[in-house]
Amino acid sequence: MEKDTLVLPSLSPVGDKPISVMIDDRCTSADGGVLLFQDVERRLNLANRLAACLHDPRQPGKITHALDDILRFRMLAIVAGYPDGNDCDVLRDDPAFKMALDRPPVSGPALCSQPTVSRIENLARRTELYRMAEAMLDLYCDSFPVVPHHLTLDLDESFDRVHGEQELRKFNAYYDDWGFLPIHIFDTSGRLVLSVLREAATPSGREILTLVKRVVNHIRERFPRVRIRLRGDSHYACPEVMSWCEATGLEYIFGLSGNATLAARVQALEARTGARYAARCAAEPPKFKLRRYKDFQGGAKSWNCTRRIIARVEAGPDGVDTRYIVTNLTDRRAQGLYERKYCQRGRMENRECPA
C-alpha cells in the first residue's frame, strides 16, 4: 500500500532538503511539534541572543556543541513538556529534536547530554544574567512593527513549586509549599516583557522599584516618547514605586489592601448598597450583583502625600464585598477606571463583570 505524504511547505528545510510528514515505521518520534517551535525560535533568534550574553570558558578546539545549540535544545525540550534536564539524555537521540537543530534524524550525531546542559545552566553570573534580561527586553521592543504610543505593563507573580532541593527554593506559608515566586511582566496584547526567577517571598518595595526602573528605562531608551502605565495588584502599590512613577511621568493603577481607615470611608456606602440589594431581592431576585463606587483622596503613614483611591462596593448573594485601587490617573471616572482599566489585567484571575 502506498503511504500518504503531507508536505508542509511552511517548515524550514534541513540541509536544503524539504521537510515532509509521512507514515514511517523507522525512526519515529512523538515530538514532531518541536519543528514548529524551532521555526518560531529561529525567527526570534532567541538562542543566539542569549548565547551572545554568555562567556564560553571551553577551549574552542574541543567544543562539540555550540552554546546557542545547547540553549536551543534546552528551550525546545521545555516547550515540548520536558522541563527536567535529565530528559536530555533520552531526547538527544530523538529524530525530531535532531532535525530541529539542523541534524539528520538518523545519521546525525547525538545532541548534548544532561551534564553539558547542567553546566551551561550554571554558567551565567549576575552580570551575564543582567545582559540576558536586557536581551529579552530588546526582543520585546523588536516585536513592534512601528513605534508604540502607549504601553500598559501588567506586573504579577506566580508560585512555581519545586520537587527537589533546587537552589534558592524557599517555603511560602501562603501556598504551604516549597518553590519560587517569579515576577512576570506582560503588556495588554499578551507579549511577554520579562520574567524574573526569584525566591518564594513577597517582593519588597525596593526590589519592585529596582525591577521597574530597569524595564522602564530600557523601553524608554528604545521608545523615548512612549506613554507607559503600570498595573498590578496590591503587592505593587508600594510608596517607592508610586513616588517614582509620579516623579518620572509614569501612570499607574494598583490594587490596594483594605484597612480600618479605608473601611471607615466606605461604611455608609456599604450599608446603602447592601440595603438596596436586599430591597431588590424582596421584590424580585436580581440577575446581577449591585455595584457602587466611591472616589476620594486618601493616604497611609508610609506615603509622602495623599493619592486618588477608588472603592468598589458590590452587594450580592454572599453579602457585601469591597475592593480598592489607587491611581494617579485623573481623566476618567471611577467606574471606568476600575472596570475598563484595572479589571482587564490578569485575564485568568480577574473576571469581574460590571453590574
Spans of features found by a protein language model:
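Generic recognition of stable, solvent-exposed alpha-helical segments in well-folded globular domains
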Residues: 32-35, 68, 83, 87, ...
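Dynamic "connector" segments at or just before major functional cores
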Residues: 1-202, 209-222
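Short, surface-exposed basic-aromatic patches at helix termini and helix-loop junctions that form
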Residues: 242-251
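Acidic/histidine-rich, metal-coordinating catalytic segments
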Residues: 156, 227-237
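Short, well-ordered coil/turn segments that N-cap beta-strands
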Residues: 149-151, 224-228, 250
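An anionic, glycine-rich sequence signature occurring as long contiguous blocks
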Residues: 2-19, 23, 251-354
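Flexible loop/turn segments at secondary-structure boundaries
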Residues: 97-98, 160-162, 202, 235-240, ...
